Amino acid sequence: AYEMQRSLVGSEMCIRDRKWIPKTVVDSELQVNENDTQIHIKGREFAYTIDKRTALFTEMKFAGREYLNHPMELNIWRAPTDNDMYIKSEWKKAHYDKAYTRAYTTEVVQGKHGVKITSHASVVAETVQKILDVTITWKIEAAGKIDADIAVTKDDEFPDLPRFGVRMFLDKKLSAVRYFGMGPQESYCDKHQAASHGLYQANVDDLHEDYIRPQENGSHYDCEYVELNNSRYGIVASAEKAFSFNASYYTQEELEKKTHNYELIESDSVVFCVDYALNGIGSNSCGPVVLEQYRFDDVLFRFQFTLIPYVKG
């Protein structure tokens, strides 16, 4: 299991002093088995499954608890905002809202300190050429820590991406959120002047911005660390390079589908997005398009982050 060491001064925390200390686990306890469609990785306290068809996790069990209610996804879509009213048609024409991940080859290498799983994949949609070429590498340690390294090449004939990241559908009991980034209100690359960088705590309910017309909301920009937990267990996402996250009871599909806020129906999960980047919000409902420096127009990029499920001991 992983235990936490915190360094707190008042309400602020030195993230670099926050360390996750694994109990001694010898690598011989890590078992890796695969068949035509799945890779099963099992340690003393965890059991993970990766689908070879997507290169993504379908099961993430730690200390006997399943963290994922539904399979993990690569995510390039967001529920269009009022300011996306014009670019939305370009995104829809590119079928970004219907995109999914398809893996072609997978290599499994077991070493001294864990297992490394590398897949070559694409983000695709029906009737259009490949949107993204992706190399996904997972490194899983014997204590259950997961390091992700996702290298992406975008077809530059496609429009700017709404976002790129990983979407997880977590156990709904993981309702307490602690993060180090821009807060306490929602923040985006071009919408954070009223926010400040610091350590914040909230419940998932608190992170939802209740716009009358449902749309993308509640993201937090420039984060180094986010933790979702309850009184007994949790999961951490962290990265050396700042990222954005979103934790919500509503899927992007639900936010897009409904016309009024009172029509929204909660998911059976905490929808947890860990994002490399999102396109800027802009003001194009009544003003200019997103400024060039806030457009997510990268053609080559690499997203590295760490996931650590844990129990409180």
Residue ranges of predicted features:
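Single conserved hydrophobic/aromatic residue that forms the stacking wall/gate
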Residues: 2-10, 14-15
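Beta-strand/loop-rich accessory regions of lumenal/periplasmic or secreted enzymes
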Residues: 18-313
